[in-house]
Amino acid sequence: MKFEKIHNKGQAQIFRNKYLEYLTKTHPLVIWSLYLPVIIFLLYYSIARLHFSAGKALLLFGSGIFFWTFFEYIIHRFVFHFVAESPRARKISYVMHGNHHEFPRDSQRLFMPAVPSIILSSLIFLVMKIVSGTFAFAFFPGFLLGYLTYASAHYAIHAWHPPFKWMKPIWRNHHLHHYKDDEKGFGVSSHFWDIIFGTAFNLKAEKEDKEAVQKLMFKKKEVQNILR
């Protein structure tokens, strides 16, 4: 997904049909409101109805969060950055992730839209249920929270400066992925798997361009409009 120009303003038109185009956009609070009740209910169900101990539920929940970080890396590297050859495959690749690389500051497409998100998460839960049985009721909520954390971190990286100094490497890693080399830095919420698989940036060797980074952030007025 190499583009002649990366646009820091505007957004891609993915579909000509205005209704389909509308479904490609979402607000972070919509996704949180969809999945937070599911997380709470499944944890309640695993303890109250399946009689998991609090320790067992917490272990499965934590394992789900950790598994998300691996899933995030694999999907980003091998699915979102799949090298498409045919025109149809390139179109699919662009719809899934290419539009984000061409318009990285499009605030309406920093979370997966609700409809495909619900379909995909339902399929993932079904697979987990088949593989792990009732354990999925405590494991899947952790996986979902991992996704929400990742998506929120992704949103924050494109919207604001890191709120804490220790978060700065996470921000720099993703900026370098977008603006220097999209074959590295596939982890967004964590560098762990990039380090394991040798795709991490050497942040100490990368010169930071503060002026260029400033151009990536949303302006105060933009943020206020988004949060309304």
In which residue ranges do the predicted regions lie?
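Active-site rim elements
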Residues: 180
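Short, membrane-exposed interhelical loops at transmembrane-helix boundaries
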Residues: 170-176
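N-terminal start-of-chain detector that recognizes signal peptides
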Residues: 51-53, 147, 163-167
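Non-catalytic, topology-defining segments of multipass membrane proteins
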Residues: 1-140, 152, 183-228
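Interfacial helix-loop-helix junctions of multi-pass membrane proteins
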Residues: 157-170, 183
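Residue-level detector of transmembrane insertion/anchoring sites
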Residues: 62, 66, 144, 165-168
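Alpha-helical membrane-embedded segments
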Residues: 144-151
